[in-house]
C-alpha cells in the first residue's frame, strides 16, 4: 500500500510526464519554428519556470526559458551545485534529472563554451527532498581481487584501510553498545568487530577452540533475574558435524569485566547436535532456539536450566540426544537438508523461518502458555522455486534469502507495526515484506546502472532503485535510533549502508556513517 506521501509523489511525477509529453508533441508539430532555433551567445539565456517545484535525486525536471539552443552537449545544468544529466534540449526548454545531493536547489544553466558561454540562474530554487540512499561504509575490492583480509581503519589508501568481508556473513549489534557491530562468517573463523564510532575493523574473537570456521550466527541473552544481566553473554552457532550427532552446535561466551568480548572471554559449549544453521533468543522470555540442517529440526532450551546448573557448581551436559527434556525438539519444519534461520518478531508473538536453500519464508506463531513456537506454515516465496518476482505471499519469488530484520513502520498502528526486510542474496537486493505478506524490492538492481552493462549486480551507491547495486548480499541489521541499515556485500567485500542522504561536511555527525563510494570492478 502506498502512503499518502508516496501517492502525492506519484501524482506529481504523472503531471511532470504529461508536461513533457505535451512539449514533445508541440515540438514535433512546430519543428520549423522557435524550437529549432540555435543558441545565440549575443542574447541572454533566460529561465522562466521549472516543474516540478520539489523532489529528490533522479527526479525528472523540466526547465522552461529562452535561448537554450538544440544541442544537449552544449548545455550544462547544475542544481544545488551538482551537475545534472541533461536528457533533451530545445530552444525553450531543458529536460534533465535532478542530481543526488542537490541540497540548496539553486538551478544554474550554462549554454556554450569558453568566451561564447552564457550562464543564468533561476530566480527561485528547486526544493530538494532528501531520500534514503545506499552508501559504502568500509571495505573494498581491487581489480585483481587480491586485497585479502586486513584489520584497520575504514579510511586510507589500499594496503592501509580495512578489507576482507569475502565470506557469507551475518551481522549483529552489541545491545549494550550500538557503535559495536559484530560480523561472523560461514568460512572465516574470526568474529570481527566493526567499530562505528572509531571507524575501525578488528578481530577480537579468533575462538581457536571451536572445531570449524563455519560460524553461522550471533545473538545475545536477555536478562535472567538472579543469573545473567542483559547481553552479558554472546550466543554463537556453528555448522559442524565432525562428531556425528554429538557435534558442537552452540557456544556461550561471557563478556569481559571491561564490557568487551575477545580471546580472554570465557567460552563454553552449551548445545551439541549437528549442522546448526543458527541460534536466536526470544526477545521477551529469553529462551534459546537453534536448529539442525539434518532433518530441519528446531530445538528449544530454557537458559535458566543452564545457569542453574552452573550456579550449583555442576557440569553441564551439552549433548542434545542425552537430554531430550532439556533440549526439547519442537518440530521439523519440512524435509531433511533444509538450511534455515529464525527471525523473531520484536513482540515475540511469531517468527519467520528463512529457508535459504529452498527460497521461501515460513511463519511460526508463539504459544504464550507453553512459551514455545508451533509448527510453521508457508508465508512468502515459492517452496523450492527460486526466481525474482515482487508479489503477494507464495506467489513472490526469491533466490537464497538470508538475514532479515524487523523494522517499525510509523505508518502502521496497532500490533502489526513492523515490516520485515531481508537480503535476497542471489537476486542482489534488499527486499521488504509487509505483515500481510506483500513482497517488494527495497534497494538494489539499479534500473539505470544495470542498463550500462546488462548486470543486475554491481558496486554502485546512490538512489535505492534507480542507481544502487549489490552483489551476493548476506547480512543485514538495522539501527532504529539512527535509522540506518547495514548490509554485508559478500562479493563486493564491503559493508554498505542505507540511510538518509546527508549534506557534505557532516563527517563529524555522530548520527550518520561517513560513507565512501566503492568503484572497483566486481567481476
Short names for language-model regions:
Residues 1-11:
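Single conserved hydrophobic/aromatic residue that forms the stacking wall/gate
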Residues 112, 176, 184-187, 237-241, ...:
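Short loop/turn segments immediately following the C-termini of beta-strands
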Residues 180-183, 227, 232-237, 287-291, ...:
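Conserved beta-propeller blade signature
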Residues 171-173, 218, 279, 340-344, ...:
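Hydrophobic core register within WD40 beta-propeller blades
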Residues 29-136, 180-182, 510-512, 518-520:
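Ser/Thr/Pro-rich low-complexity tracts
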Residues 468-523:
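Blade-level signature of beta-propeller repeat domains, shared across WD40, Kelch, NHL, RCC1
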Amino acid at each position: 500500500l502506498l502512503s499518502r506521501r508516496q501517492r502525492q509523489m506519484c501524482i506529481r511525477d504523472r503531471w511532470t510526464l504529461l508536461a513533457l509529453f505535451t512539449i514533445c508533441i508541440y515540438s514535433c508539430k512546430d519543428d520549423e519554428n522557435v524550437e529549432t532555433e540555435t543558441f545565440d551567445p549575443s542574447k541572454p539565456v533566460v529561465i522562466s519556470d521549472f516543474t516540478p517545484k520539489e523532489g529528490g535525486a533522479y527526479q525528472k525536471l523540466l526547465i522552461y526559458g529562452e535561448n537554450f539552443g538544440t544541442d544537449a552537449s552544449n548545455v550544462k545544468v547544475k542544481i544545488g551545485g551538482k551537475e545534472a544529466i541533461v536528457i533533451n534540449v530545445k530552444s525553450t526548454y531543458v529536460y534533465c534529472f535532478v542530481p543526488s545531493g542537490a541540497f540548496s536547489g539553486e538551478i544554474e544553466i550554462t549554454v556554450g563554451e569558453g568566451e561564447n558561454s552564457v550562464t543564468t540562474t533561476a530566480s527561485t530554487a528547486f526544493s530538494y527532498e532528501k531520500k534514503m540512499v545506499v552508501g559504502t561504509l568500509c571495505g573494498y575490492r581491487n581489480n585483481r581481487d587480491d586485497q585479502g583480509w586486513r584489520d584497520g581503519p575504514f579510511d586510507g589508501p589500499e594496503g592501509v584501510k580495512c578489507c576482507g568481508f569475502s565470506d557469507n556473513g551475518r551481522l549483529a549489534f552489541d545491545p549494550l553498545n550500538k557503535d559495536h557491530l559484530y560480523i561472523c562468517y560461514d568460512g572465516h573463523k574470526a568474529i570481527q568487530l566493526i567499530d562505528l564510532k572509531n571507524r575501525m575493523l578488528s578481530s577480537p574473537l579468533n575462538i581457536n577452540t571451536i572445531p570449524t570456521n563455519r560460524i553461522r550466527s550471533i545473538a545475545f541473552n536477555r536478562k535472567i533475574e538472579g543469573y545473567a544481566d542483559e547481553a552479558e553473554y554472546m550466543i554463537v552457532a556453528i555448522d559442524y558435524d565432525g562428531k556425528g550427532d554429538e557435534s558442537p552446535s552452540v557456544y556461550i561466551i561471557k563478556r569481559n569485566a571491561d564490557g568487551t568480548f575477545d580471546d580472554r572471554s570465557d567460552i563454553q559449549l552449551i548445545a551439541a547436535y549437528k549442522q546448526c544453521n543458527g541460534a536466536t533468543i526470544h526477545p521477551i522470555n529469553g529462551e534459546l532456539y537453534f536448529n539442525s540442517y539434518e532433518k530441519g529440526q528446531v530445538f528449544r532450551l530454557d537458559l535458566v536450566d543452564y545457569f542453574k546448573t552452573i550456579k550449583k557448581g555442576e557440569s553441564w551436559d551439552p549433548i542434545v540426544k542425552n537430554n531430550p527434556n532439556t533440549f526439547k525438539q519442537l518440530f521439523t519444519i519440512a524435509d531433511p537438508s533444509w538450511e534455515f534461520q529464525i527471525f523473531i518478531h520484536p513482540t515475540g508473538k511469531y517468527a519467520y523461518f528463512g529457508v535459504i536453500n529452498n527460497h521461501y519464508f515460513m511463519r511460526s506463531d508463539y504459544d504464550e502458555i507453553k512459551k514455545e513456537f508451533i509448527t510453521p506454515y508457508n508465508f512468502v516465496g515459492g517452496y523450492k522455486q527460486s526466481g525474482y518476482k515482487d508479489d503477494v505471499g507464495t506467489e513472490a519469488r526469491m533466490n537464497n534469502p538470508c538475514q532479515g530484520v524487523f523494522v517499525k513502520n510509523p505508518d502502521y498502528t496497532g500490533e502489526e507495526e513492523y515490516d520485515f526486510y531481508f537480503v535476497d542474496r542471489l537476486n542482489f537486493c534488499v527486499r521488504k515484506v509487509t505483515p500481510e505478506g506483500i513482497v517488494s524490492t527495497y534497494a538494489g538492481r539499479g534500473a539505470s546502472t544495470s542498463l550500462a552493462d546488462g548486470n543486475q549486480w554491481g558496486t554502485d551507491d546512490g538512489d535505492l532503485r534507480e542507481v544502487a547495486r549489490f552483489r551476493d548480499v548476506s547480512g543485514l541489521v538495522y539501527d532504529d535510533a539512527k535509522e540506518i541499515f547495514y548490509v554485508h556485500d559478500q562479493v563486493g567485500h564491503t559493508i554498505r549502508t542505507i540511510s538518509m542522504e546527508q549534506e557534505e561536511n557532516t563527517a563529524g555527525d555522530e548520527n550518520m556513517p561517513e560513507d565512501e563510494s566503492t568503484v572497483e570492478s566486481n567481476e
